[in-house]
UniProtKB/Swiss-Prot annotation:
Family assignment from sequence similarity: Belongs to the TrpB family.
Species of provenance: Xanthomonas oryzae pv. oryzae (strain PXO99A)
Record flagged with keyword Nucleotidyltransferase: no
Protein name: Tryptophan synthase beta chain
Enzyme class: lyase
Function: The beta subunit is responsible for the synthesis of L-tryptophan from indole and L-serine.
Gene Ontology molecular-function annotations: tryptophan synthase activity
Catalytic reaction list: (1S,2R)-1-C-(indol-3-yl)glycerol 3-phosphate + L-serine = D-glyceraldehyde 3-phosphate + L-tryptophan + H2O
One GO CC term on file: cytoplasm
Subunit structure: Tetramer of two alpha and two beta chains.
Amino acid sequence: MSAQPISDFYAYPDAAGHFGKFGGRFVAETLIGPLQELSAAYDQARQDPSFIAEYDKDLKHYVGRPSPIYHAERLSREVGGAQILLKREDLNHTGAHKINNTIGQALLASRMGKTRIIAETGAGQHGVASATVAARLGLECLVYMGATDIERQKINVYRMKLLGATVIPVTSGSATLKDALNEAMRDWVTNVRDTFYIIGTVAGPDPYPRMVRDFNAIVGREARAQMLEDYGRLPDAISACVGGGSNAIGLFHAFLNDPGVKIYGAEAAGDGIATGRHAASIAAGRPGVLHGNRTYVICDDDGQITETHSISAGLDYPGVGPEHAFLSDSGRAVYQGITDDEAMAAFHLLAHTEGILAALESSHAVAQSIKLARELPKDALVLCNLSGRGDKDVHTIAAREGLAL
């Protein structure tokens, strides 16, 4: 935890892309130029009213924003304690928060004259969102995806192909999200002249952590205004799942300077942190460099990245966005591990009480919100980011429960 309290969280990152001791730009010399070009283009675009207007128009008419806040009354009664509210990002076009970011980056790619976009994906939602905006803007799209994730997310793989994208299986390493990101980086280095890399989470070298955060920050801005309009006050606590952490930082950002709002991130504890089969980078990791930024990573005593595990492909990543590492160290946010079993139980409870199938990623946040609600009085408000819908996970859940579909 930082020695001195931080009065303004919006002062970060600094000009070099650092969130305290985290973040930065640790990349090969060949990527310095492209990253500088991207940073300059983004800083120019975000100050351009016409770019902002185009982005806002797409969020409204294409994505379907604003997404509502739903009071999960039956779930709240079943759990006891505080009232659980759901920010319904699962209702967005493509079924998750990911399109908030891909729309912004794809518009930036077109503005920069790029004709080819590449992306990495774990659960497949970012791949689907990237393929979707590529089709809309007439851009070529390649999506790198770990072979392990392809097996557990066949529906999203086919969705990407239906949208015209090429899906490249990655078999190196653990054949999951980190390996897909590695391969996408290699592609970008080779084809930087005509290619734009749409990173799906708040990781990577600067400017990606702040750019992806900014494009997802609509979630928190909406939620803050909706809470004040519908409930006359801010929530007592907010919760979101954290792998890389894009949906979480999207919700958290609008509340960072509100000390009365407690912030919680749900990491993937897998089979339990003590077993070593997890993906809880903050709870069980240590500072290191991964994919171009300094953050908390899961590694061995020699600093080598180790394999992770989560039932959720989107959380199965051995690092976390540098802003989350910073928020944890500063004490502003608390990150807790949620096991596979806890996420599964939350998935079923939400389905049975509210008729909502949450993504396995989002189910980690639902499980955390249930725990928080049980510790708070009945009039307290817990806002949970329901970052995606669970259609993509039906086969995974059935297989875990011994059912063949």
